[in-house]
Structures are given as structure tokens and as C-alpha cells.
Swiss-Prot record:
GO terms for molecular function: (R)-carnitine:4-(trimethylammonio)butanoate antiporter activity. Pathway: Amine and polyamine metabolism; carnitine metabolism. PROSITE patterns: BCCT (PS01303). The lineage of its organism: Bacteria, Pseudomonadati, Pseudomonadota, Gammaproteobacteria, Enterobacterales. Catalyzes the exchange of L-carnitine for gamma-butyrobetaine. The chain crosses the membrane at residues 10-30, 51-71, 92-112, 143-163, 195-215, 231-251, 263-283, 316-336, 347-367, 398-418, 446-466, 475-495. The gene is caiT. This is L-carnitine/gamma-butyrobetaine antiporter. It is found in: Cell inner membrane. Belongs to the BCCT transporter (TC 2.A.15) family. CaiT subfamily. It is a multi-pass membrane protein. Keywords: Antiport, Cell inner membrane, Cell membrane, Membrane, Transmembrane, Transmembrane helix, Transport.
Amino acid sequence: MKNEKRKTGIEPKVFFPPLIIVGILCWLTVRDLDAANVVINAVFSYVTNVWGWAFEWYMVVMLFGWFWLVFGPYAKKRLGNEPPEFSTASWIFMMFASCTSAAVLFWGSIEIYYYISTPPFGLEPNSTGAKELGLAYSLFHWGPLPWATYSFLSVAFAYFFFVRKMEVIRPSSTLVPLAGEKHAKGLFGTIVDNFYLVALIFAMGTSLGLATPLVTECMQWLFGIPHTLQLDAIIITCWIILNAICVACGLQKGVRIASDVRSYLSFLMLGWVFIVSGASFIMNYFTDSVGMLLMYLPRMLFYTDPIAKGGFPQGWTVFYWAWWVIYAIQMSIFLARISRGRTVRELCFGMVMGLTASTWILWTVLGSNTLLLMDKNIINIPNLIEQYGVARAIIETWAALPLSTATMWGFFILCFIATVTLVNACSYTLAMSTCREVRDGEEPPLLVRIGWSILVGIIGIVLLALGGLKPIQTAIIAGGCPLFFVNIMVTLSFIKDAKQNWKD
């Protein structure tokens, strides 16, 4: 019994360093918010301007890697000897469900406004050209390219899970073929795992920082409760307590049901927006945007704007590529685990087609609705953002739809459930990654899960206290830098091991 408790306890070398690092950074930030904002702006400017090109080349190289997997020697290799665990329809649905987070609802509703008001390629703000490129850029940032990069990492993790039969809960476990067992399980592997965990903590705190204002703004619209930072903190605290109760009382089945409800409600809400907003315009705008994407794709791939220095690729493309990089390992592990028994080609094609369809539907419907509301002068987004913040502007794009009260209730429930499942997933992932030998199907210790959910909640509150999108963008970019190298090492380790051990 003692031995079992020891096995499921924390792993000090990957538990305490991230905890201490993140705790110190939060303390320094809260101590002087103005100084923290100065540092944040400097970090954002340095990384995006000096190293933005590296993120763009990373995505392009990983895209070529996707083609190599689909048409190369491993295309017909099966990831495990068992038949697929899920039907193709269920598999695709699970992929869609993974895309319906509150952060996705945040960006899907407001992103097009930023692209139109501060457009790329020297276009005039709010011009016809800017509007024509608005949705096309969303389809670029949330389309086949990033999902192709995830395909490569998902194949790598599925290979280590189901072909090599490895227990992978941290990235260092996959680096034995590349770095050797001594280094992968030694100091080098510990450093890699700590980079991963610090970045993941900030990424999850960022998602909470995006999701919480949506819920509190919904509460203000529905119940008249003023949206304040204190209310944000109270709501985050309630989510943490609710998560602790669910875990302590064995209500994980309830959380899974909530996740399913979130997915079905997402379909319902998107269908409603599509019908009442203007189905004909949405389909025409989407079709035109696909054409614009194909026409501008080469420039989008390599756009760094070093001459005009307008800042668009740094503020958006590099930011989003860092976003994809920082979530790559966590997301790829999930996608790999639900893809047992499929061939490499099936996994690559299924991910790119299924997940691209998911994100394209979300961004097309929500972005088109926002554009229509702007063009018809139904809402004034710049004024809303200036007076009340981005979250209020997003809420108003939903409140402007017919049957506004019912629509807002649906959106409120969707955001609330999405954030409950987010906090649960955050605490579970971090607890699994910082505990010793917690195998698949086992639960990490309750106190560890609660502790991590509290820390993620604190980060969300700190980012909200800083105000604006720049702190959130900087947290993602800073976290994406070390994981940029970790993702590359995992990929190279897979290639090296597969060449030696995955032969006919």
C-alpha cells in the first residue's frame, strides 16, 4: 500500500520548479502591474520581430513533413495492432469537440474585426480589400496548415504509444531515441519537461483569461451584475471549487457528459447564427475567402513585413503560430490516444480534413456574423472595445441576433460549460504530468489536481488584471519559444526511432 502511494505521489523534479517559477512571475507581476506591462511589451516586440521568421519556417517545414507521412514509406503503417477504437464518425466528432473551447468562441467572434481595422499588405483599414481578406486570414490561421503540423506530432505520439508501447505522460519520455536514455531520463529530460509544464501552465491560464470575461459579461447582460475584476476572480474561484467537488465526489462522468453537452450545444448555436445571420452571405463570403486564401497563400506563409513594419504578421501570424506550438504536445497526445488502430495516412487526412472543417465552420459563421453587424451599423465594435473591453464587444455580436435573450442564455451556458471542462482538463493534464507513474486509466491525487487548478486560476486573474490582449498574446509567445525546440526534438526522435524499428 505504501508503495502504491509512493508511485502515485508527485514527482518533485517536475512539480516544484514550474510551481516556483510561475509563482515568482505572478508575484512580480502583481507587485507592479505597470512595470510588468512594460516588460510584456518589450518581450512581445523582441520575440515577434527578431524570431518571428523561425515560427513561420517551422510551420512550413512541418507541412512538408505531413506530405512525407501521407505519401512516404509509413503511410500505410498501422498505429497499433488493434482495430480502430472509435468509428470514423465518432472520431471526427471527438475532434470537433476538442475545438469548441471558450477561447475559440472568443477569437472566432472578434478576430475578423482586428483583421479589417488593421489589415495586412498595406491595405486601407475597413476597405473592401481588407474585408475580402478578413475571413481568408482566419481560414489561414485556423486551417489545414496548423492541423498538418499537429498531424506529424500526433503520429509521433501514437507511434510511441501503440507501436513502441511506451508510457508517455511527459515529452522527455519520447526523447530516448534522440538523446539516449541517460540524458532523456536525466537533467536534460527534466529541463525539457519543466519547459513544457511552465509553457502549458501559462497557456491554460491564458485560455482561462479569455474565457472568464465572456461568462461575466453574459452575467451582466442577463442579470445586470456589473462586470468587475472582482467578479472575474469570484467566478474563477467557483470553477475551481466546482472542479474540486467533481473530482472528490467521483463526478468525472458528469464532467464528460458536460463535455458532450458543450459539443451538441455548439452545433445548435452555430446553426442558429448561420440561419438568422444570413446563410446566403455566409456561404458566398466563405467561397470568396477560400479563393482569396489560395491567391495570397504564398505571401501569407512567409509574410514578415520587414520593410513597411506594419506589425500585422508579428501581432497575429507569429502569435497564432506560437499558440499552435504551445498546445501542440497536449493536443497531439489527446488526438493520438483516440487514433489507435488507424494508419498514418488515415490519421493525417482525418485530422486535416475533420479539424479544418471544424475550425472553418466556427470562424466562417461567427466571423461573417460580426462583419454583417459591422456593415449594417448594428453595433460599433471600436467604441465597445474602448469603453467596455473586448469581451463586451463579443457579447454584443451575439446579443444583436433575433431572440436575443434565448441566444444569450445559450451562449452563457456554452461558455460556462466550456470553462468548467477547461479547468477540469487543465488540472488533470498538469497533475498527470507532475506525478510519478500515473498510468492511463488511473487518477492523479486530488490535492495535486486542486493545486494546479488554483495556480491556473491565479494566472488567469493576473492576466485579466493587466488588461487588454497584449499580456495574453505575450504569455503565449513566451511559452511557445521553448516548446518550439521541444516539438522539433520529439519529431526528430520519432523519425530516428521509426527508421530503426518500424520496418516491414
